[in-house]
């Protein structure tokens, strides 16, 4: 690699909204996220259905499904 053209690659702490944090390496100085593997429903096994403003009901009504 050429000298002086690449950004610094530092160890950073990734902070999740759930309170979990872990170390990784990045060119950024800090990283925050809303969902991580500790709180994501796929990884925790706590799947939940999110029905935003009755979209499922509107779909069923529109296409005649009961």
Swiss-Prot record:
> What would be one Pfam family of this protein?
Ribosomal_L31
Which residues are noted in the entry as Zn(2+)-binding?
A: 16, 18, 36, 39
- UniProt keyword terms in alphabetical order: Metal-binding, Ribonucleoprotein, Ribosomal protein, RNA-binding, rRNA-binding, Zinc
InterPro entries per record: Ribosomal_bL28/bL31-like_sf, Ribosomal_bL31, Ribosomal_bL31_A, Ribosomal_bL31_sf
The domain of life for this entry's organism is Bacteria
List the signal peptide residues. none
Annotated GO MF terms: metal ion binding; rRNA binding; structural constituent of ribosome
Query: Coiled-coil region(s) at which residues?
Result: none
The cofactors it requires, by name, are: Zn(2+)
> Which BP terms does GO give this entry?
translation
Instruction: List GO terms (cellular component aspect).
Output: ribonucleoprotein complex; ribosome
How many and how are cofactors bound here? Binds 1 zinc ion per subunit.
What is its biological role?
Binds the 23S rRNA.
Q: Which family does it belong to?
A: Belongs to the bacterial ribosomal protein bL31 family. Type A subfamily.
Q: How does it assemble?
A: Part of the 50S ribosomal subunit.
* This protein's name: Large ribosomal subunit protein bL31
Task: Name its species.
Answer: Geobacter metallireducens (strain ATCC 53774 / DSM 7210 / GS-15)
